[in-house]
């Protein structure tokens, strides 16, 4: 199939999708992205949510974040759930665009039907922490803790492990954030004292 694609012999959506899946299984996401991208551009493959998601994920796994970002955006707008906004938010976070990360992650929560809303709240808390919005960060970490019991696994043991891991993660971030908020408060008081006594 790959040779047929190289010679531009593929002309059916199914052929492009199968080749994409084979390349992804072979851990060749860059090639997979090129294949599905060509298929979409040449209109052999329908530009729908599913195929855009394939393309975005392949670019993402290829570390081609600049190419993944606009495709995630387009796919997220078409999606029925918020998962693709979460992926987009992770790209923004990885590239230090914190306002966009926060906006995208919040859109993901609003759209709903997320596999793991607890992790999204933790991510939002981390973004707020990085912006030194400690009260907002604390709110997100507390929301995470409130929703941990909603997370389900394959079985009881898996559920316990997932919940425990997320609970510990949220608690560590919450403690860290509260300590940092206090440290910054004390530094600001000292700075104010120094300015008044100068």
Locations of regions flagged by a protein language model:
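Short, solvent-exposed mixed-charge patches
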Residues: 196-198
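Alpha-solenoid helical repeat scaffolds
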Residues: 1-131, 136, 142-194
């Amino acid at each position: 199939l790959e040779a047929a694609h190289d010679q531009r012999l593929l002309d059916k959506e199914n052929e492009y999708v199968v080749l994409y899946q084979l390349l992804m299984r072979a851990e060749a996401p860059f090639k997979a992205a090129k294949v599905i991208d060509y298929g979409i551009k040449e209109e052999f493959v329908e530009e729908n949510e599913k195929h855009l998601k394939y393309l975005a994920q392949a670019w993402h796994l290829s570390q081609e974040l600049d190419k993944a970002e606009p495709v995630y955006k387009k796919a997220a707008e078409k999606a029925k759930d918020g998962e693709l906004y979460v992926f987009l938010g992770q790209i923004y976070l990885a590239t230090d665009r914190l306002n966009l990360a926060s906006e995208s992650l919040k859109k993901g929560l609003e759209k709903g039907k997320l596999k793991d809303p607890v992790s999204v709240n933790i991510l939002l808390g981390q973004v707020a922490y990085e912006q030194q919005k400690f009260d907002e960060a604390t709110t997100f970490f507390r929301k995470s803790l409130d929703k941990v019991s909603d997370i389900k696994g394959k079985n009881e043991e898996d559920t316990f492990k997932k919940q425990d891991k997320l609970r510990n993660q949220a608690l560590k971030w919450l403690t860290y954030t509260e300590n940092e908020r206090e440290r910054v408060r004390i530094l600001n008081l000292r700075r104010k004292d120094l300015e008044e006594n100068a």
